[in-house]
Curated annotation (Swiss-Prot):
The record marks 176 as: Important for dimerization. The keyword Oxidoreductase applies. This is Oxygen-dependent coproporphyrinogen-III oxidase. GO terms for molecular function: coproporphyrinogen oxidase activity; metal ion binding; protein homodimerization activity. NCBIfam families: PRK05330.1. It comes from Ectopseudomonas mendocina (strain ymp) (Pseudomonas mendocina). A divalent metal cation binds at residues 97, 107, 146, 176. GO terms for biological process: protoporphyrinogen IX biosynthetic process. Its EC number is 1.3.3.3. One of its GO terms (cellular component) is cytoplasm. The active site is at 107 (proton donor). The lineage of its organism: Bacteria, Pseudomonadati, Pseudomonadota, Gammaproteobacteria, Pseudomonadales. The gene is hemF.
Amino acid sequence: MTDRTEAVKAYLLDLQDRICAALEAEDGQALFREDAWQRPAGGGGRTRVIENGALIEKGGVNFSHVFGDSLPPSASAHRPELAGRGFQALGVSLVIHPENPYVPTSHANVRFFSAEKEGEEPVWWFGGGFDLTPYYANEEDCRYWHQVAFDACAPFGAEVYPRFKAWCDRYFHLKHRGEPRGIGGLFFDDLNEWDFDTCFAFMRAIGDAYIQAYLPIVQRRKLTPFGEREREFQAFRRGRYVEFNLVFDRGTLFGLQSGGRTESILMSLPPMVRWGYDWKPEPGSEEARLTEYFLTDRDWLSGA
């Protein structure tokens, strides 16, 4: 393992520790259970899962470092010149599903790839981002989430936030439904256009911004009263989350195709989901407003 890979690994392990500690403190009841695992083909990871807490119904914060002799199809399909190279893949990926429907689901991921071939320089890139999936959305929360994203990107250039915000809107889109998964955030992949140190610094900025973006929203909404109606709508909308993760998500596809650990890969799925045939919310309801107003690709910072 190169010095660069060692530095990335050390950061990711520390990031996992810090995020888990912050979420445990906010929940105040449940603790993460750690499951260290090994991948027979090379590598392993630390899966941490929290369930049935005062705040978090189910959540997972996963670190993985896997390696192998050839990249799986999901990683080389859009870069055929890398086919046949060995690889190192490191990342932290997390999804938090709160019980209260007024607290959004959040997702974050930061990762590093290095495609290697003897006698040649490694081809490396970073990826990651974070995005928010509300059920009963609030404009204040949407603006705040995107403001933290904007601030994290600002030191790296004025064009970075709008570019990666738009990429997030495109990526987290359910093509078969014609709607976004949530209100977006940031998404980037194949990042190697800057030098290594700058790209690594950007990945750290995004990883470090997640707790700053999410916890204030949690704190504002976690005591909002809710009932059976809100829980049923939350379960219905969680179905969209499942559809995206199993059909479109590149991380899920890479993990399954590379022989990753299935329990860790699928830890992002919510615990309770429902599908209703051709179900539609009542016109003018808060449930209808989610799709009519919030689930659109809009500039949340304009006029903010």
